[in-house]
Swiss-Prot record:
Pfam families (UniProt xref): GMPPB_C, NTP_transferase
Pathway entry: Nucleotide-sugar biosynthesis; GDP-alpha-D-mannose biosynthesis; GDP-alpha-D-mannose from alpha-D-mannose 1-phosphate (GTP route): step 1/1
Subcellular localization: Cytoplasm
GO biological process, one term: GDP-mannose biosynthetic process
GO MF entries: GTP binding; mannose-1-phosphate guanylyltransferase (GTP) activity
Annotated EC: 2.7.7.13
Keyword Cytoplasm among record annotations: yes
Protein name (database record): Mannose-1-phosphate guanyltransferase
GO cellular component, one term: cytoplasm
Keyword GTP-binding: yes
SUPFAM superfamilies for the chain: Nucleotide-diphospho-sugar transferases
Length: 361
């Protein structure tokens, strides 16, 4: 089987992290975001994976060659000379996707969930339609495009309603699909949207179904959602693989700690914390609902909550970081500094407080 991952552009929503590392390689729970997807596709029997990108593939090539060997898959880049939206990339990769005339998966690279690829493929074959969308239930459907089903046929999609004012349903498109190769014939090689241009044709043909996703789902393409997705992932891990979570007197709730990290016995971590490789955590440090990426240091008695600390960064003593702050690569926060919602660009040193949301350049 084959899969296409829509990687797209510059990952601007996840800046300042993506100023240094392409978004698919930013670590989510200590593994590159895209690796979660490659592993799930490989486990479902996918042998050919296409990454649809429109910048910096050369940075990713080396890392992904390693995964090819590890997971026994072939990974190719489909490079767009202009952004082609969410449907154009399928046309561009037509050769690979039509290779053996079997259905193929399409997924948005920002989506984190318990990927149900095997079950999705079986469901798709059983209903005989041309496409299946994975649907997830949400609490506030009025913020999304909602899937409305055909009354007579289970799971057959009747229409989509964009940001409904009245309740029509609570299932939304989760950004994962399986499609038959003939769907590519409906797409032109130009910037085009699968949601707005391709799916309505399949709905008209009564050939588009939805598959309900069990468990958590999150689009982690921006810092707030990256942290929320981390909470969901850790919660899921506590049920599926509790042995992967850290244990100890100074651990509260769900925490992942890389074995190479050095953590003071008087520091307290959790709930919902990820500590990357070669991180150093000083005495009396308190970290909650945060991610500390590799090679960073949090010095004594600092408080870090709802924050992403980028690679090679240093947080001084008695600092307080909160409010969805993000430190880019190689940032230094001097002693006793307060940062609330600051986005600090790479290679900056800050010695003044950042009391409200701001970009520090």
């Amino acid at each position: 089987m084959k899969g296409l991952i829509l990687v797209g552009g510059y990952g601007t929503r996840l800046r300042p992290l993506t100023l240094t590392v392409p978004k698919p390689l930013v670590e989510f729970c200590n593994r590159p975001m895209i690796l979660h997807q490659i592993e799930a596709l490989a486990a479902a029997g996918v042998t050919d994976i296409v990454l649809a990108v429109n910048y910096r593939p050369e940075v990713m090539v080396e890392t992904l060659k390693k995964y090819e060997k590890q997971y026994g898959v072939s990974i190719t880049f489909s490079v767009e000379t202009e952004p082609l939206g969410t449907a154009g990339p399928l046309k561009l990769a037509e050769k690979v996707l039509k290779k053996d005339n079997s259905p193929f998966f399409v997924l948005n690279s920002d989506v984190i969930c318990e990927y149900p690829f095997k079950e999705l493929a079986a469901f798709h074959r059983a209903h005989g339609g041309k496409g299946t969308i994975v649907a997830t239930k949400v609490d506030e459907p009025s913020k999304y495009g909602v899937i409305v089903h055909d009354i007579a046929t289970p799971n057959l999609i009747d229409r989509f309603v964009e940001k409904p004012v009245e309740f029509v349903g609570n299932r939304i498109n989760a950004g994962l699909y399986i499609l038959n190769p003939e769907v590519i014939d409906l797409i032109e090689l130009r910037p085009t949207s699968i949601e707005k241009e391709t799916f309505p044709i399949l709905v008209e043909q009564k050939s588009l179904y939805s598959f309900d996703l069990e468990g958590y789902w999150m689009d982690v393409g921006q810092p707030k959602d990256f942290l929320a997705g981390t909470v969901l992932y850790l919660n899921s891990l506590s049920k599926r693989h509790p042995e992967q979570l850290a244990k100890g007197d100074n651990i509260v709730g769900n925490v992942i700690i890389d074995p190479s990290a050095k953590i003071s016995g008087s520091a307290k971590l959790g709930p919902d914390v990820v500590i990357g490789p070669n991180v150093t955590i000083g005495e009396g440090v308190r970290i909650t609902r945060s991610v500390v990426l590799s090679d960073s240091t949090i010095n004594d008695h600092s408080l870090v909550k709802s924050t992403i600390v980028g690679w090679h960064s240093t947080v001084g003593k008695w600092c307080r970081l909160e409010g969805c702050s993000v430190l880019g690569d190689d940032v230094e926060v001097k002693d006793e500094v307060y940062v609330n919602g600051g986005k600090v660009l790479p290679h900056k040193s800050i010695s003044a407080n950042v009391p409200k949301e701001a970009i520090i350049m």
